[in-house]
Amino acid sequence: MGIILGNGNVLNQAGELTPMEILVEKGRITAMGETLDRCGHDWIDCHGGMISAGLIDAHVHLREPGFEHKETIETGAKAAVQGGFTTVACMPNTRPSIDSVETVTYILDKASEAGMARVIPYGAITVRQLGKELTDFAGLKEAGIFALTDDGVGVQSTAMMKKAMQKAAELGIAIVAHCEDEDLLIPGAALHDGVVAARHGLPGIPSESESIHVGRDILLAEQTGVHYHVCHISAKESVRLVRDGKRAGVNVTCEVSPHHLLLCDEDIPDNLDTNWKMNPPLRSREDRAALIAGLKDGTIDMIATDHAPHTQEEKANGINRAPFGIVGLETAFPLLYTNLVQTGELTLKKLVELLTVKPAEAFKLPYGRLEVGAPADLTVMDLETEKTIDPSTFASKGINTPFAGWVCKGWPTLTLVDGKIVYQNV
């Protein structure tokens, strides 16, 4: 017996929504058609929603082990499926860092126990993410990591980054970088080095702290041949560097977060609400425009949430002391659909690709496809019903979002992972 998703629509090659039913059996899509034989199968009414491949997020912070007061693998995985994400890659800035086979195994086991989204851990580039000694890349790869990164901090040593890229290239592992030159940072800086920081008399985080590392690493990637991926790109100069790198034939990809696409520093309220504090910071209107242009022309390969939960107590410490980061798994698709697709900035087809097939292709994942024979990772979206973002309804432990109160369409109503229903609100 299988499951038929009926009364739904899928995007065709022209980007048009067309009626389609999908049969799921033994974790795979086994049939697709406008009308399927229901005999012997359970039938789920999708109420006219859009059926897509499950969303993929290449950048989340699940906080476990070590920071379970912020989030756990279970609560993060629940948040993922509630937001339509079926595969998430979790960053290594935990305690201990994900720098050993034992920690990788721990995370994979915890994710399996949770039985929600598929969680794939990153491995740290350097031991304890201190930038001094490379981890056991081969051992981490065999244990099942997604890629290698020291996200949370940038690899400051050019020599260390080159050595990491050389070794990763030999093993066929991607190097994923949080690009931030600490020599250009002023202690306590929390906002972009722009008009808002100046208005409040605060030190700012300059765009060049990001773009200098992007440029450095693209040159190293060209020399070593590694797949190099830039995290949460935020500055127009970084977009230009990635575009130039692609044109030169460098194997470089990058991601952008929803908040950098939808907000700029001038949107930050005068009370400096710390739910608007993230790293990279919200940058200028010009930077935001460059990010959207980068999505349109293919410079930016995917959208990733950079889901970063913190407690309310931590976020109450004021703009200078509160930790960087906001949550994003449960609001990403509705926000992007409402504010980019419905406004005409992106097509629906393009948005879905940026959240499914594009990250799958970049990181060579067998997911993100809506076709017979593909894994039955599926999401159904209600593109018509309006709902208000209410952090009290989040499955995540974190409620740190600047988007509370925003009214959106495009809410997930059903999520399947490997053919198993893990979220249902139909």
Swiss-Prot record:
GO terms for biological process: 'de novo' UMP biosynthetic process; purine nucleobase catabolic process. Transmembrane segments: none annotated. Its cofactor is Zn(2+). It catalyses: (S)-dihydroorotate + H2O = N-carbamoyl-L-aspartate + H(+). Substrate binds at residues 61-63, 93, 279, 310, 324-325. GO terms for molecular function: allantoinase activity; dihydroorotase activity; zinc ion binding. Zn(2+) 2 binds at residues 151, 178, 232. Pathway: Pyrimidine metabolism; UMP biosynthesis via de novo pathway; (S)-dihydroorotate from bicarbonate: step 3/3. SUPFAM superfamilies: Composite domain of metallo-dependent hydrolases, Metallo-dependent hydrolases. Its EC number is 3.5.2.3. Zn(2+) 1 binds at residues 59, 61, 151, 306. Keywords: Hydrolase, Metal-binding, Pyrimidine biosynthesis, Zinc. Binds 2 Zn(2+) ions per subunit. InterPro entries: Amidohydro-rel, DHOase, DHOase/Allantoinase_Hydrolase, Dihydroorotase_CS, Metal-dep_hydrolase_composite, Metal_Hydrolase. The active site is at residue 306. GO terms for cellular component: cytoplasm. Catalyzes the reversible cyclization of carbamoyl aspartate to dihydroorotate. Belongs to the metallo-dependent hydrolases superfamily. DHOase family. Class I DHOase subfamily. This is Dihydroorotase. It comes from Brevibacillus brevis (strain 47 / JCM 6285 / NBRC 100599). The lineage of its organism: Bacteria, Bacillati, Bacillota, Bacilli, Bacillales.
